[in-house]
């Protein structure tokens, strides 16, 4: 840690002693890439407020880097995996999900997707084993007396650490495949009649056939698809804790779920008291651009600029795709700033400049920005919402197709398919988003909704973490559904009992009627004989 950061940190620690004593110790179980970028914003704010934040990360971590100066402390534990192992896996997963997995049939697509998820699950369980079975590490964590643990629900293990350390924990989450974690671990409600299943790319305004599709998705994810190899995880958790348990049972003990979206993005749906939506917590006003970049932006005149970024994971775009995209960009009057780390396309126009990195938030907040070409990552979409910039989506994998579908449904974006799009498709989508005022109007409506919140998303996220620390949990917000079996939750035992009562009554009434009928019949016959 640099002298500068050490001084800042010591001042913050001293402020705790002279304050009301509310500063706490936060342990973090992180996730890589955009998940970490989002969570880091929360952690930096916690540090600003005087809390001690320690991130538990493996020696193979890609982004959580101990060499970078920060007031956030790192506890690095050894693992047999290497950074190259993880990078290679993520790149292969990205390529397979984006280009190789066929979308021709529902069954084939999700069967291959489950294989990918289970490979990811195997990496996660290895990292988890290396942490919780490290006796020296666990002893050190026990002695540190943490107040709370913050984890991303996509990567299991944080809840196991919290259980072993006997501390409350919270989740940060965008979504899990098919809402499997939210349903089974969080008890969330998703009525299929009007809440589209994630990855279905549907909106809340579904016609009859779309509701059928949504129901099929829901049944598939509820009864067939497993985002994790649950047998392995359940067995591992039971062995470590020394009692029979399951992954989802342990996840169900989360005090709060901080969902990284908001109602400017989500479709309205019911949610539980221990859920808060904090989408866009990383967004902030734009800062001035570097001098050379600002000069290029200003040279666009009244036509303005287009910002183009497909995120940090795409670094191997084919030459054919790059040329096709560059050709489309060359045909618009706007200047284009394209985040691209590859061979310069032959069709690159004079209006387009390539950059290995872009100050994306600052560009989207620039008054000359007319449109944003994005892969549909949640962080990028929220920066576009924050600054009111309409989008053209080129979704690649994970939640990106669904994110862009949400923006399309709200009239703030158009999308093209990277597998099938032509230069003409991209050009037409760009022209529509830039020239048709309805897209700007709709994104500005979402932007106004986002800014018109009683408490900022980041402040709400930090409030709930501090709340859990102050009260040693938030059990009063946790629904009793977590204590019920599947049969009890769906009231199947009650329904069975009531049906049995009705059946018994019908049986008894029938028997009584038959008895009376026989008596009357015998009486009638006797009178005839007399």
UniProtKB/Swiss-Prot annotation:
Parts forming coiled coils: none
GO biological process: estrogen metabolic process; steroid metabolic process; xenobiotic metabolic process
Keyword Transmembrane helix included in the entry's annotation: yes
GO cellular component: endoplasmic reticulum membrane; membrane
Function (record text): UDP-glucuronosyltransferase (UGT) that catalyzes phase II biotransformation reactions in which lipophilic substrates are conjugated with glucuronic acid to increase the metabolite's water solubility, thereby facilitating excretion into either the urine or bile. Catalyzes the glucuronidation of endogenous steroid hormones such as androgens (epitestosterone, androsterone) and estrogens (estradiol, epiestradiol).
Gene (UniProt): UGT2B17
First and last residue of the signal peptide: 1-23
The protein, known as: UDP-glucuronosyltransferase 2B17
Domain of life: Eukaryota
């Amino acid at each position: 840690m640099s002298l500068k950061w050490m001084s800042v940190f010591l001042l913050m620690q001293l402020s705790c002693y002279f304050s009301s004593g509310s500063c706490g110790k936060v342990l973090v179980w992180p996730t890589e890439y955009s998940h970490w970028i989002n969570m880091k914003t929360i952690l930096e704010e916690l540090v600003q407020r005087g809390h001690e934040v320690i991130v538990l990360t493996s020696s193979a971590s890609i982004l959580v880097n101990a060499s970078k100066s920060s007031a956030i402390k790192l506890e690095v534990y050894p693992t047999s995996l290497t950074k190259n192992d993880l990078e290679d896996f993520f790149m292969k997963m990205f390529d397979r999900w984006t280009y190789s997995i066929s979308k021709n049939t529902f069954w084939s697509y999700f069967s291959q997707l489950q294989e990918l998820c289970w490979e990811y699950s195997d990496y996660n369980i290895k990292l988890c084993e290396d942490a919780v079975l490290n006796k020296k590490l666990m002893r050190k964590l026990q002695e540190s007396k943490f107040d709370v643990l913050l984890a991303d629900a996509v990567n299991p293990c944080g809840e196991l650490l919290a259980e072993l350390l006997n501390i409350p924990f919270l989740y940060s989450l965008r979504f899990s495949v098919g809402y499997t974690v939210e349903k089974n671990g969080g008890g969330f409600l998703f009525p299929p009649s009007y809440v589209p299943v994630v990855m279905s790319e549907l909106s809340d305004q579904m016609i009859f056939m779309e509701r059928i599709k949504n129901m099929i998705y829901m049944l598939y994810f509820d009864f067939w698809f497993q985002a994790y190899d649950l047998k392995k995880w359940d067995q591992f958790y039971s062995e470590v804790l020394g009692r029979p348990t399951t992954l989802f049972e342990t996840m169900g003990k989360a005090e709060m779920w901080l969902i990284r979206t908001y109602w400017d993005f989500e479709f309205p749906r019911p949610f539980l008291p221990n859920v808060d939506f904090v989408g866009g917590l990383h967004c902030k006003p734009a800062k001035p651009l570097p001098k050379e970049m600002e000069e290029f932006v200003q040279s666009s005149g009244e036509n303005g600029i287009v910002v183009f970024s497909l995120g940090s994971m795409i670094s191997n775009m084919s030459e054919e795709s790059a040329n096709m995209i560059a050709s489309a960009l060359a045909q618009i009057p706007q200047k284009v700033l394209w985040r691209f780390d590859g061979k310069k396309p032959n069709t690159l126009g004079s209006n387009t400049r390539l950059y290995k990195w872009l100050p994306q938030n600052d560009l989207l907040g620039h008054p000359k920005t007319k449109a944003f070409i994005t892969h549909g990552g949640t962080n990028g979409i929220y920066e576009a919402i924050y600054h009111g910039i309409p989008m053209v989506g080129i979704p690649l994998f994970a939640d990106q197709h669904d994110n862009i579908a949400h923006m399309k449904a709200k009239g703030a974006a158009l999308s093209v398919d990277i597998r099938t799009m032509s230069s003409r498709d991209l050009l037409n989508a760009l022209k529509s988003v830039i020239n048709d005022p309805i897209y700007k109007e709709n994104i500005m409506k979402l932007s106004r909704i986002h800014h018109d919140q009683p408490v900022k998303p980041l402040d709400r996220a930090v409030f709930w973490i501090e709340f859990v620390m102050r009260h040693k949990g938030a059990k009063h917000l946790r629904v009793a559904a977590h204590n019920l079996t599947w049969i009890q939750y769906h009231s199947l035992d009650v329904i069975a009992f009531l049906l049995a009562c009705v059946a018994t009554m019908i049986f008894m009434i029938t028997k009584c009627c038959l008895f009376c009928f026989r008596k009357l019949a015998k009486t009638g016959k006797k009178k005839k004989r007399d």
